Amino acid sequence: MAHGPRYRVPFRRRREGKTNYRKRLKLLKSGKPRLVVRKSLNHHIAQIIVYDPKGDRTLVSAHTRELIRDFGWKGHCGNTPSAYLLGLLIGYKAKQAGIEEAILDIGLHPPVRGSSVFAVLKGAVDAGLNVPHSPEIFPDEYRIRGEHIAEYAKMLKEQDEEKFRRQFGGYLVKGLDPEKLPEHFEEVKARIIEKFEGEGARE
C-alpha cells in the first residue's frame, strides 16, 4: 500500500468505486438539477437531484419496476427499450414537478455511445426535459424499440427452441412473445404519454 508524508487516503466512496469527486464537483458547479441515471443487471433507476449542503435532495424519481406496476411492461427491465421508457417517465415526472432542465449524471458508468444509460436520456429529452447532449450518443430507433431483441428471438426459436424458451422464459411466463416486443414497446410508450398528456392529465 502507498505511504509517506505526501500520500492521501482517497475518500471512502472513491475507494469503493461509487463516486468520481472531480466529475461530481464539475456537475455541482453548473447549479442545475442533475438527471442521475444508474443501472444494475436487471433494472434502471433515474432521479432528478439537486445539491444541498446538508445532503443531496431528490425531487423526482422513477424505477423500471414502475413500468411493470403502472404501465403493464412485460419485457426485461435491464434492456434498452425499458431504459428509454424509464427516461420518458422521469422526463414527464420532472416536467410535472416544474423542472424544465437538468444535466446528465451517469456516475461511474462508462459513456458508451448507444448504451442504455443514454436511452434513458433519450426518453427524458423526448418527454420535453432540456438536457445538454449530442444526438450521436443515443441508441438508434431499431434498438430503442427492441427490434434487435425480436430478431434474435426469432432466429433462436428457429435454431434451438429449447434454448429460446430458457432465454426468454421471463417473457413467455408473462404472456409476451419476444418477437412482438417492438409492438409491446409502442403500447407501453403510448400509455405513459396518455397518462401525462391525455385528457385526464389536463383536467
Swiss-Prot record:
Q: Which family does it belong to?
A: Belongs to the universal ribosomal protein uL18 family.
Q: Which UniProt keywords apply?
A: Ribonucleoprotein, Ribosomal protein, RNA-binding, rRNA-binding
Biological process (GO) annotations? ribosomal large subunit assembly; translation
Any one cellular component term from GO for this entry?
A: cytosolic large ribosomal subunit
One Pfam family for this entry, by name? Ribosomal_L5e
The record ties this protein, via InterPro entries, to: Rbsml_uL18_euk
Encoding gene (name):
rpl18
Asked if the record carries the keyword Ribonucleoprotein, the reply is yes
HAMAP family in the cross-refs: Ribosomal_uL18_A
Gene Ontology molecular functions = 5S rRNA binding; structural constituent of ribosome
Question: Which species is the source of this protein?
Answer: Pyrococcus furiosus (strain ATCC 43587 / DSM 3638 / JCM 8422 / Vc1)
Alphabetical list of NCBIfam families matching this protein: PRK08569.1
Q: Which domain of life is it from?
A: Archaea
Q: What is this protein called?
A: Large ribosomal subunit protein uL18
Job of this protein? This is one of the proteins that bind and probably mediate the attachment of the 5S RNA into the large ribosomal subunit, where it forms part of the central protuberance.
Oligomeric state and interaction partners are given as: Part of the 50S ribosomal subunit. Contacts the 5S and 23S rRNAs.
